[in-house]
Amino acid sequence: MAKAKRTTKFVCQSCGYESAKWMGKCPNCNEWNQMVEALEPSKKSRSAFNHTGEPSKATPITQIASEEEARVETNMPELNRVLGGGVVPGSMVLVGGDPGIGKSTLLLQVSAQLTLTNKKVLYISGEESIKQTKLRAERLQVSGDNLYVYAETNLEAVQETIDFVKPDFVVIDSIQTVYHPDVTSAAGSVSQVRECTAALMRIAKMQNIAIFIVGHVTKEGAIAGPRLLEHMVDTVLYFEGERHHAYRILRAVKNRFGSTNEMGIFEMRDIGLVEVANPSEVFLEERLEGASGSTVVASMEGTRPVLVEIQALVSPTMFGNAKRMATGIDYNKVSLIMAVLEKRVGLMLQNQDAYLKAAGGVKLDEPAVDLAVAVSVASSYRDKPTRSTDCFIGELGLTGEIRRVARIEQRVQEAAKLGFKRIFIPKNNEGTWKVPKDVQVVGVETIGEALKKALPD
């Protein structure tokens, strides 16, 4: 007997107006191109069920058993750190990134690593045949009897295969290629992505299966499709980096089961992605000693201190308005710091072009990088280099004061481990904590004092 086809409707994303057919302009709010297709909920789906498939009921929170479910470690410490200690069974993880950055490579390697823990993994590809996936696996030198590969884009066929294989983990590569047969729009459309993600989320919760889904990104770098996609999943990971460079950075921008401040570093090689155990050495290995405009900051990425080089190039402008550019550092932060240098130190920067960069493709957004940015700008402006063994840590206030930062001891220890002998920190961070041997800690109260000591006349 043929399966009854579920009816669809069109809903305005601006005001919620519903229509039986698509319209270019919503008659209720007069917005254009806001009508998207959605499935009419069946009578069965209107009943409330919990994640086990049983009827749901309200329960006092004091009567709910407090059980911390064990995470599954992936044998990839960098990924475990970003996920908060491992994969949570029943969770749904969205992995986004530019084309060719290595999303599929990462997940295929993760799948193989999970099979080493006697877990069954189903890798579903909507972009490659099973033979193509096998060729990629051979290049990456990954294999395993518990790694199942399936090439399909029909969501119902995917659900049947999951029920048959009964995996512990599922990878969907990618969500934009999967389609729901009851939705008439093309795969990758707003309605298809929403319905397919909702169905996969139900599978993850009801069967306690961890599901990784790959998401395409737009040219602006955001996950393609409705913003609802990122709201529905438990964790959103972004894989960043330049395709023409070897290093990749994995960040969590949403994580219901851990911190969103952690960062994992990988290096792309012929055999796939290799973890970088000490990223500070990587980011500093090509630093040119004795160059003006170059400073080093000890930045915290979650619980890990990372040393990053900050480069500044300040030169007289050839046009009426000075140009400002920043890569890896917030543009507004750069403008604020340069304004403080003009007002509190007297640097004439209004007729100077300024270009700043965090080396290695890292994005720095914490306040502790302010002092290093300010010193690098002043160093380039005066064409006077700092010592190659100097490190700068501190937040810069609008009145020119250097404000205290968190976890100063960890930052100083990381800098000392890599051979930095003189470390500038806020005066208020000086205390009873242990200073590493052969390291001079310089406490400064203002940016003027810091520049006098770092760039003496």
From Swiss-Prot:
Q: Which residues bind ATP?
A: 97-104
- What organism is this sequence from? Listeria innocua serovar 6a (strain ATCC BAA-680 / CLIP 11262)
Q: Any idea what this protein is called?
A: DNA repair protein RadA
Q: Which domain of life is it from?
A: Bacteria
Q: Which PANTHER family match?
A: DNA REPAIR PROTEIN RADA (PTHR32472), DNA REPAIR PROTEIN RADA-LIKE PROTEIN (PTHR32472:SF10)
Q: Where is this motif: RadA KNRFG motif?
A: 254-258
**Single GO MF annotation:** ATP-dependent DNA damage sensor activity
One Pfam match, by short name?
Zn_ribbon_LapB
Instruction: State which gene encodes it.
Output: radA
